[in-house]
UniProtKB/Swiss-Prot annotation:
Protein's gene: MADS17
The name this protein goes by in its record: MADS-box transcription factor 17
Region annotation (Disordered) ranges: 228-249
Protein location: Nucleus
BP-aspect Gene Ontology terms: positive regulation of transcription by RNA polymerase II; regulation of transcription by RNA polymerase II; specification of floral organ identity
Tissue expression remark: Expressed in the floral meristem, lodicule, palea, lemma, receptacle, empty glume, stamen, pistil, and ovule.
Main location: nucleus
Oligomeric and partner information: May interact with the K-box of MADS6.
K-box domain residues: 88-178
Amino acid sequence: MGRGRVELKRIENKINRQVTFSKRRNGLLKKAYELSVLCDAEVALIIFSSRGKLYEFGSAGINKTLEKYNSCCYNAQGSNSALAGGEHQSWYQEMSRLKTKLECLQRSQRHMLGEDLGPLSIKELQQLEKQLEYSLSQARQRKTQIMMEQVDDLRRKERQLGELNKQLKNKLEAEADSSNCRSAIQDSWVHGTVVSGGRVLNAQPPPDIDCEPTLQIGYYQFVRPEAANPRSNGGGGDQNNNFVMGWPL
């Protein structure tokens, strides 16, 4: 039956701790020796006990291995330092270049503003004059372009307002005509006139006409007896028509 898994924590019992240290130390030294022999590796092992006692193993000697270790660490630190120094040098050169460019731009700006012109030669002043003329020309062109765009915008708004004003005017005229027509119709009903096609017609009923209605049946005409009286026509009425009391003979 195998042993259970050992819990990795400090052994509280002093005797057991000392026994375990001795066993594990001897095993570790044995493994270091086997590794150096089997793999032809340079192995160095240094152990200090809890009481400060030194135990060591070196396949090629502890001092030689330590010197080799220190040499490797120093070279690594030197290479890192060289890389850091080169990076710092690169940043310093970039900073110097940007600083020089900034000073040049500031000096050019002062010249554009008419400052510090004393040290400039005639050729430099002529070049500065050309630059100022070019800048002035560009500024004027840009100003003219902006003004033309604003004028076009104002004209477009003016056309829109004109169309809107025309629509409102037509709408008001149509509403006024409709209102006048309704008023005229109302007045016509009050005063007995009717407006038709722009003409005023009299809507009052015509006066009574003294006439007698007639009734025609077929091809015969009925006449009231008073109208058929021959005396009203000066006599001789019976001899001139074929009607007697409205009926044919």
